[in-house]
């Protein structure tokens, strides 16, 4: 019985780690949801290459919401940025991977 519980706990943990955890956002709801979905897609597609994932997010955001978007993806960074109001999203994905997306023109 203990083995079955361990597998269930592991499955629950993996399921929790596949959803983005938003730490801070001042984006409008619709933009935030689209950006979160884009971040999840990019991080899953380029799971071994954060630079390619960031490039995909930046290029898509530039096309969809105008230019001057910036993206940082990593496991160990801090940031202090200047950004346009209602254009910032900071989230965690996969447990330890942080994604920061902001617009600054």
Swiss-Prot record:
CC annotations in GO: cilium; cytoplasm; dynein complex; microtubule; plasma membrane
Compartments where found: Cytoplasm, Cytoskeleton, Cilium axoneme
SUPFAM superfamilies, A to Z: DLC
Family matches, as CDD domains: DLC-like_DNAL4
GO annotation terms (biological process): microtubule-based movement
Major site of localization recorded for this protein: cytoplasm
Domain of life: Eukaryota
GO molecular function annotation: identical protein binding; microtubule motor activity
Keywords: Cell projection, Cilium, Cytoplasm, Cytoskeleton, Dynein, Microtubule, Motor protein
Pfam family for this entry, one: Dynein_light
Disease: Mirror movements 3: A disorder characterized by contralateral involuntary movements that mirror voluntary ones. While mirror movements are occasionally found in young children, persistence beyond the age of 10 is abnormal. Mirror movements occur more commonly in the upper extremities.
Record function comment: Force generating protein of respiratory cilia. Produces force towards the minus ends of microtubules. Dynein has ATPase activity.
Subunit structure: Consists of at least two heavy chains and a number of intermediate and light chains.
Family (UniProt): Belongs to the dynein light chain family.
Name of the protein this chain belongs to: Dynein axonemal light chain 4
Species per Swiss-Prot/TrEMBL record: Homo sapiens
